[in-house]
Amino acid sequence: MRDFIQHLQDRGILENFSSGLDNVSTPVSAYLGFDPTAPSLHIGHWIGICFLRRMAHFGLTPVALVGSATGMIGDPSGKSIERTLLEESQVAYNSQKLSECLAYYLPGVQIVNNIDWLKETTVIDFLRDVGKHFRLGVMLGKDTVKQRVQSEEGISYTEFSYMLLQSYDFAYLFENYGVCLQCGGSDQWGNITSGIDYIRRHGLGQAYGLTYPLLTNSQGKKIGKTESGTIWLDPKLTSPYELYQYFLRLPDQEVPKVARTLTLLSNEEIFDLDQKFLLDPVAVKKFVAETLVTSIHGEDGLREAQVVTQSIHPGKVSSVSEKDFQDLVAMGQAVSLEGTQALGKRWIDLFVALGVCSSKGEARRLIEQKGLYVNSEPIENEHSVFEETQVCFDQYVLLAQGKKKKLVLRLI
């Protein structure tokens, strides 16, 4: 354990750990939980996935827990208001999708689900066997609970009970799977230490906890959230291109932290990047973005991201091959129209009809700002029409709104 902890400290991604953990010399099994609040993992979960991979690299036995049972309750940690409770069928669906995702990213890692042991537990048994080991004074003193109790929103008994369920999970894994270490983000420290105390009070043995810092920007907001929503790992929800662009647009000062937290580059490679970053932050940012997209979506995902990126830059359409257009169509970045329905029509009307712009007013404003593109060339004015000379490879036209919205118009 000492080498693992030293690695995390050197990398700057260790927040807290239990006293004595660094002296444990016997093989350690450790777990990290994922609640199924959505049908996909998001970029914040990638921290946990990388953490589990690091554990395996240093000889620990990682276990991933899907929290179907706890997902029915909702973790109050880091939340200022209560989560909306999900239907049981939705939790079951989300759990299945998360299990598939974890199995893909963590081949060989054991995946367990707490519904398997909590579904048979009665309320009476839970209160007698688990509840009696917890003291309200201690629970109310936990930061997450304290903040919610003092807030206008308050905290429901449902959320208040989450700590007990997570503690029971830890004890169950300790007793049945030999798991003595629970890991998680820094906002989980209170829940983790409650589990350690419960295991001790129950006379099961010595357990430990370890947390890593949450990935936040300079304003303290979690990285992975945008104005348009969450950055998902599922390519159907967040395309490789969108993921790539998200990291390319990160403020320069966030890049070293992202490289340390979200990549599996060695510490030596990270330290080397730090030096290169001082000389050329843009090049390092591009490298980190490419590394992350490849790790999450593979080489094909990176190529997809690069193809779309190349195709939407002004003046670059001449370098887009017919195969690139075909790839864009295959990626779902296309709409088909009969040539007679499109040729000769005003572009301002087509951009609205195709959903690239929400209204003609928006389209006019963007045209004035040189923000609407046909084949990477800005539309000159609102009277510009679709001409046959703009068709590439007899059937394709590349449309874009700025650098974000892009669409291939395919003539049939």
Swiss-Prot record:
This is Tyrosine--tRNA ligase. The keyword Nucleotide-binding applies. A motif ('HIGH' region) lies at residues 36-45. Its EC number is 6.1.1.1. Residues 345-412 form the S4 RNA-binding domain. It holds the Pfam family tRNA-synt_1b. A motif ('KMSKS' region) lies at residues 222-226. L-tyrosine binds at residues 31, 162, 166. Keywords: Aminoacyl-tRNA synthetase, ATP-binding, Cytoplasm, Ligase, Nucleotide-binding, Protein biosynthesis, RNA-binding. Catalyzes the attachment of tyrosine to tRNA(Tyr) in a two-step reaction: tyrosine is first activated by ATP to form Tyr-AMP and then transferred to the acceptor end of tRNA(Tyr). One of its GO terms (molecular function) is tyrosine-tRNA ligase activity.
